[in-house]
Amino acid sequence: MLQPKRMKFRKMFKGRNRGLANGTEVSFGEFGLKAVGRGRLTARQIESARRAMTRHIKRQGQIWIRVFPDKPITSKPLEVRMGKGKGNVEYWVCQIQPGKVLYEMNGVSEELAREAFALAAAKLPLKTTFVTKTVM
């Protein structure tokens, strides 16, 4: 699963997921899966969607993952009293704003790409849409 190799600080503030997205254009492949809603993706969800797509296209074509989980989420163990510091890092997430391209695909037909992205979208907690590369 995806996570940073090393970080300057182990734990992070919760923060707020506001603002506009970077990476809103399909830049590597022909087709993309774009987030419509706002939320956060865990490393497990990103990997699960990637596996679903890879299996469906039967290893033809190429897939790019355009998001990376770089925010640690902590939690305290069950039945532990309040206080005594922040909990341990449990998993990693990336915050998603509307318009962010999550995955890209190349080397397959549009029909196959749509089916693969539909399988991937079912694994994700966000509303997504299928996009194609715009040629200027």
UniProtKB/Swiss-Prot annotation:
Presence of the UniProt keyword Lyase in the record: no
Molecular function as annotated in GO: rRNA binding; structural constituent of ribosome; tRNA binding
Keywords: Ribonucleoprotein, Ribosomal protein, RNA-binding, rRNA-binding, tRNA-binding
Record-linked PROSITE patterns: RIBOSOMAL_L16_1 (PS00586), RIBOSOMAL_L16_2 (PS00701)
Biological processes per GO annotation: translation
Segments forming a coiled coil: none
CDD domains referenced in this protein's UniProt entry, alphabetically: Ribosomal_L16_L10e
GO CC terms of this entry: cytosolic large ribosomal subunit
Keyword Ribonucleoprotein annotated: yes
Chain's role: Binds 23S rRNA and is also seen to make contacts with the A and possibly P site tRNAs.
Family according to the record: Belongs to the universal ribosomal protein uL16 family.
Subunit structure: Part of the 50S ribosomal subunit.
Protein name stated in the entry: Large ribosomal subunit protein uL16
Natural source organism: Shewanella piezotolerans (strain WP3 / JCM 13877)
Chain's gene name: rplP
